[in-house]
Amino acid sequence: MRNPIIDVGAKELSYEIREIVDVAKKIEEFGINITWENIGDPVAKGEKIPDWIKDIIAEIVKNDCSYAYCPTKGLLETREFLAEQVNKRGGVQITAEDIIFFNGLGDAIAKIYGLLKRQVRVINPSPSYSTHSSAEASHAGSPPVTYFLDPYNYWYPDIDDLEKRIKYNPAVSGILVINPDNPTGAVYPKKILNEIVDLANEYDLFIICDEIYCNLVYNGKKQHLLCEVIDDVCGLSLKGISKELPWPGARCGWIEIYNADKDEEFKKYVESIYKAKLIEVCSTTLPQMAIPRIMGHRNYKKYLEERNRFFEKRSNTAYKKLKDLDGVIANKANGAFYMSVVFEDNYLNGNNSIKIENEKLKEFIEHQIKDASIDKKFVYYLLASTGICVVPLTSFCSQLNGFRVTLLERDDEKFEWIFDTLAEKIDEFLKT
């Protein structure tokens, strides 16, 4: 090309959750059946959408308006419905004008980070959902700035570590919180959220809280939303329907803007997000039309309770299978539908492996992992020997070696097999 055309931030873009699929497809050619535990798509894992939800959507499809553009921020009726849900919680109060729809939260995340001044940093949790960490690092053109989630303390944020990293890095202007958390399944107590808000207030920061899993909370944990604790701090809550209905293929998410009137700089920032959406015209109309009718339906609360009971059962089974393994730190997931497992360092020697029967497949895998992290080696050995596809924990912006696995499998017998096999192969890997 006449000139260099690649932005310096492009090197920071990574999404192992999908990238591993290419390797898995190659492994399928060796006759291995793949069990996909790498991505959080409940529908792909066999979850059935209730008929009453399908009936609502089918009726909307017959309405010609569902094929038209909608207002740039989203349908007014839907935004009013969602604003009312926030206001019922008694914390910060918003209007429909404080909500903007996007084509999935991936779209929202790209704009949220992409419209920040390049020198500004948003500190991410570690581990962190890779869409956030990659987008933030790409915007800045340098690796993510992170704070530690402690696997020895239920994956809760280390607040002292967070404060130090804010205090000694003046570029940090925002804090990312993911609650319930992906990839760990942690659900944060109100006390921790209050402490994060206090830090944001003290250092004059804004908060981004990804709450896409906010209605997937179980094991007796209580849901606490940012809107309940944010007080006068500026913030954005990210929500959507991909995981909750679930309707991931709709690509429908939104941001709720809190306290934009409290800071002129933050107000201009959210105005820039809106203007970026103006250029795109709007987000998809049909799923927006469905939201009030589905979430306001008499069956919806019961439906959420049923889903949470299912994931609670899965969480407890998975934890029981893995918690007593030597060399493993396992925490019970209490929200979302993922579990993250950590390998203790003193069990890792650089030569850990899992036996692969097919010599040609073994040769292929060992070529793939020649310079890989230890946990990526585990993931690829596991994939080749069993067909189970999980994601290395280091791909979630973490220094910890381990993996993330979903709790989505609907078939009880197969779910038991997945976690029995994981336990067996973890033991083999850590003892070689």
UniProtKB/Swiss-Prot annotation:
E.C. designation(s): 2.6.1.-
Domain of life: Archaea
GO biological process: biosynthetic process
Cofactor section: pyridoxal 5'-phosphate
Annotated Gene Ontology cellular component terms: cytoplasm
GO molecular function annotation: pyridoxal phosphate binding; transaminase activity
UniProt key word Transferase: yes
Protein's UniProt name: Uncharacterized aminotransferase MJ1479
Entry's localization field: Cytoplasm
Family the UniProt entry places it in: Belongs to the class-II pyridoxal-phosphate-dependent aminotransferase family.
Organism (species): Methanocaldococcus jannaschii (strain ATCC 43067 / DSM 2661 / JAL-1 / JCM 10045 / NBRC 100440)
Primary localisation category: cytoplasm
Keywords: Aminotransferase, Cytoplasm, Pyridoxal phosphate, Transferase
Modified residues (N6-(pyridoxal phosphate)lysine): 243
Statement: the UniProt record of this protein carries the keyword Nucleus: no
